[in-house]
Amino acid sequence: GQHHDASTGAVMPPVYQTSTFVQTSPGQPLNPDYEYSRAANPTRTALENALASIENGTRGLAFSSGLAATDCVLRSFKAGDEIIAMDDLYGGTYRMFTRIYKDSGIKFQFVDINDLETFQSLINENTKLVWVETPTNPLMKLADIAAIAQITKANNILFAVDNTFAT
């Protein structure tokens, strides 16, 4: 949840519009959590804590772009792992999968995710993630999140849903 500010009583955190924070000497920040806003700042920390609370998680992560978040997820996998993805994805995501991660040893398989029979036939012991975008950009295809979640849960596979276009 959201905690109030003890010094002001404010129930909403302020937006910190600073890039740097006080240092007692070079490389020695006054508060070890905050040295430079690109790494961390109190506003982003408040957002991440709120997201974790809403999702009943232990930690939330906020990124400056969807592709940065996608890259973070993909770095959880190793050579030999397989990822099943929708056949219609945002171009940047598709290029990340097929070009940037081309030499990673991670195998990407693209499928009409609403053809559940074909989708299930691609699942094997190396399948670690199913990646869905719904609605898709630009074709506005929709995916049956509930049905896919049931399949991934039954197979102990992670399931990621990018709903950027909906938001």
Model-derived features: positions:
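Short conserved active-site loop signatures built around small residues
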Residues: 1-11, 15
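Residues at alpha-helix termini
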Residues: 8, 54-55, 104, 155
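Conserved N-terminal alpha-helix of the aminotransferase class I/II PLP-enzyme fold
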Residues: 20-71, 76, 92-101
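Conserved PLP-enzyme active-site core in the AAT-like
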Residues: 61-167
